[in-house]
């Protein structure tokens, strides 16, 4: 198995970078005149809109780019989550040498281990409670703020229960059920934890690659039929839409640079980053390329991590991103609160004033919630 290609500090820095993209995207894409993203479905008119904005840039260009590309922080989170699962549950000393050889050798034979349901259920319960601990503090605070501010949502019993149970992603019309919207991520992560423990945990690499190819293949079929369809929307709301970056995280933890190569040279890594960014932009302009963008997002992530650790004059940025990674969980659950409060400022014309207040208040509130969440006992495995 790969030994710590991504250090804990590097993982925190990448989480920080990912959450910056996510929480800025989740503000910018709510603004009417700003380019919309292709997160769950592929809308050609959104890419045409982006091309038009790039051809005629104005003062809002950074907001357009954050709105269109910021949601790709989610694949980075999925990649890091899978990487962390493998490093935690599959690294030595949990496995014997024979088990590791069978699992990680590229030419290894198929496993025939039987499944004991008690351990998987304990694993799923533990990770559900970890997600619940993270979600509940933000959900309670958000619903109270939502109720006392203009435009409050009409909540229904099924929506509340499915949110707390983290099965809202599988219900029809998830766009209308999940509120606040970013909380769809909790249902997605629970599904991926289940898939990992039942299908991929300590299994031959072929299981992971096979599931990735199956999910990508079905998505392409849906895309060829109608990339704007509700079927595509529901598909990508669930684990199938996140299987590519999640699977890459598993494989990268096991095989390292056989999966995603870094160059261990700052200059070469910079060129690699530029190459990835160019590919991400160009592939985002058509449905087939859009399907594979998360791969290059993950590659860009490991290149950035390597670059941040090797270039001394980037150490200040590295430390800031590390700290953002530490508060990323709290920032994820609290940014819908501050968005609801400050977005009217941007909608009424002063986009950057509202955005700046949102950034400052979100980071401060996330730090406070991080301290609060430390007081909540962790679930026992």
Predicted segments, located by residue:
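Histidine-centered divalent metal-coordination motifs
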Residues: 25-26, 332-335
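Alpha-helical transmembrane segments and terminal signal-anchor/GPI-anchor hydrophobic tails
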Residues: 219-330, 337-358
């Amino acid at each position: 198995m790969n030994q710590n290609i991504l250090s804990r500090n590097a993982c925190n820095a990448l989480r920080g970078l990912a959450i910056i993209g996510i929480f800025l995207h989740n503000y910018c894409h709510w603004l009417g005149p700003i380019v919309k993203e292709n997160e769950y479905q592929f809308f050609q008119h959104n890419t045409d809109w982006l091309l038009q904005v790039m051809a005629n840039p104005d003062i809002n260009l950074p907001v357009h780019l954050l709105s269109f590309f910021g949601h790709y922080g989610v694949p980075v989170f999925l990649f890091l989550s899978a990487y962390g699962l493998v490093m935690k549950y599959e690294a030595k000393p949990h496995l014997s040498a024979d088990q590791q050889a069978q699992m990680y050798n590229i030419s290894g034979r198929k496993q025939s281990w039987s499944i004991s349901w008690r351990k998987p259920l304990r694993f799923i319960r533990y990770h559900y409670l970890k997600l619940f601990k993270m979600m509940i503090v933000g959900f309670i605070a958000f619903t109270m703020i939502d109720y006392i501010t203009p435009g409050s949502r009409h909540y229904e019993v099924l929506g509340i229960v499915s949110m707390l149970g983290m099965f809202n992603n599988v219900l029809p019309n998830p766009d209308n059920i999940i509120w606040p919207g970013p909380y769809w991520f909790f249902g997605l992560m629970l599904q991926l934890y289940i898939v990992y423990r039942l299908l991929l945990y300590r299994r031959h690499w072929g299981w992971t690659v096979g599931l990735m190819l199956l999910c990508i293949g079905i998505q392409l079929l849906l895309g060829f039929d109608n990339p704007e369809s509700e079927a595509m929307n529901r598909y990508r709301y669930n684990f199938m839409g996140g299987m590519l970056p999640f699977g890459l995280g598993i494989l990268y933890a096991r095989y390292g640079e056989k999966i995603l190569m870094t160059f261990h040279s700052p200059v070469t890594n910079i060129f690699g980053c530029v190459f990835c960014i160019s590919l991400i932009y160009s592939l985002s302009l058509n449905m087939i390329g859009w399907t594979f963008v998360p791969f290059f997002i993950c590659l860009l992530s490991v290149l950035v991590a390597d670059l941040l650790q090797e270039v001394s004059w980037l150490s200040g940025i590295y430390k800031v991103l590390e700290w953002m990674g530490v508060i990323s969980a709290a920032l994820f659950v609290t940014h819908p609160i501050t968005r609801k409060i400050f977005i009217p400022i941007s909608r009424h014309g002063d986009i950057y004033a509202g955005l700046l207040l949102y950034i400052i208040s979100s980071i401060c509130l996330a730090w406070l919630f991080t301290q609060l969440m430390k007081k909540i006992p962790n679930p026992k495995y």
